[in-house]
Design a protein with these regions (language model features):
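Acyltransferase/transacylase module recognition
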Residues: 103-182
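Alpha/beta catalytic cores of group-transfer enzymes, especially the acyltransferase/condensing modules
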Residues: 1-139
């Protein structure tokens, strides 16, 4: 955890960036708009639920994306108070540093499936878990797919640990009957 935090802080200083929540526009349109911004880095970074995606990238790239996405019909484009462009190519220096630390750490075969947001899939293989932990720094968070896969695999109860109930709200938007608590 400390190695990841230090690597990400260093990457934020090396490659300043930010993130913004885009509300009320379909994922494909957000992807399309981000792809046409050529001179700056901006990508969909968090697929939270249908109609709610967070974009991440350079300061100028996110600013341009917010403007274009509002013009394309987004209900809201809200800049987030974050320290960097997480889950984007701007985190590549952190990914390189974290890869070394993870590769030098022994992982055992999982005794239960772990859903990793980089793919949304359940895994138990130490090699796949390691690869996904490394990839998550520069790859999008596929929370929508993660929720869908958990539900398909029989999820019935969700206990949210930590402050707030953000994840419970996202699960409610799936329209699936689940027992939610924190």
């Amino acid at each position: 955890v400390a190695a990841r935090a230090n690597a990400m802080q260093s990457a934020c200083e090396e490659n300043p960036g930010t993130m913004a929540a885009i509300i009320g526009l379909d994922n494909e349109k957000i992807e399309e708009v981000c792809a046409i911004i050529k001179d700056e880095i901006v990508i969909p970074a968090n697929y939270n639920c249908n109609g709610q995606v967070v974009v991440s990238g350079s300061l100028k790239g996110v600013e341009i994306a917010c403007q274009l996405l509002k013009e394309a019909g987004a209900k809201r484009a809200l800049p987030l108070q974050v320290g960097g462009a997480f889950h984007s190519p701007l985190m590549e220096p952190a990914r390189v540093k974290l890869a070394e630390a993870i590769q030098n750490t022994k992982f055992n075969e999982g005794i239960c499936p772990i859903y990793q947001n980089v793919t949304g899939q359940a895994v138990t293989s130490p090699d796949i878990i390691k690869a996904n932990l490394i990839s998550q720094l520069t790859a999008p968070v596929r929370w929508t797919q993660t929720m869908e896969n958990m539900i398909v695999n029989g999820l019935t109860d969700v206990i949210e640990v930590g402050p707030g109930t953000v994840l419970q709200g996202l699960f409610k938007k799936t329209g699936t009957e689940l027992q939610l608590s924190s």
